[in-house]
């Protein structure tokens, strides 16, 4: 009986340690991304990959229904202004706090990525982003714009701390690839 108990405890310890070592995730995509920079190229494989590392203000499910992601709520507060309340307590993969400053930094950067073959300007042009407090932003448009939540599903939010001065190459190398998404980026081996 004692041997059976020792065997059981030993097997349980092996299973627990085996699960702890199984921490590597390999992602397979139909097509390889052209970059890990979430704002470099608005392309299906890039966007699919970025979703694993970064988050948007608004999420969209398989039925194109919106759900809260980094924003917990959004509503038009007048004909030309939307208010987005940001989720509190969110941490970047480096441990720093997510704030409205990251959103403002993101929208400025996403429109100005050098040599982008297909940018995210389509979703940001004609909009003015204003920080109200650390967890509230207003987005203003020239005329009523009911598609604002849809546009905010597309642009991945990046860390202002990690992204300041970062190039597309810094994202590809992992130096600036700090997200809030479900997986933390470790390495990208093009063609692997």
Locations of the language-model features?
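Cleavable N-terminal signal peptides
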Residues: 9-10, 20
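N-terminal lobe/hinge region of extracytoplasmic solute-binding protein
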Residues: 28-78, 108, 176-182
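Short, well-ordered beta-strand elements
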Residues: 23-34, 81-83, 103-107, 137-139, ...
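Sec/Tat signal peptide C-region and signal peptidase I cleavage site
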Residues: 16-22
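Extracytoplasmic/secreted proteins, especially bacterial periplasmic and envelope-associated proteins
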Residues: 48, 52, 65, 69, ...
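Surface-exposed binding/hinge segments that line
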Residues: 75, 119-164, 182-189
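Aromatic- and charge-enriched surface segment that lines or borders ligand/interaction sites
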Residues: 73-116, 138
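Bacterial N-terminal signal peptides that target proteins for export
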Residues: 1-8
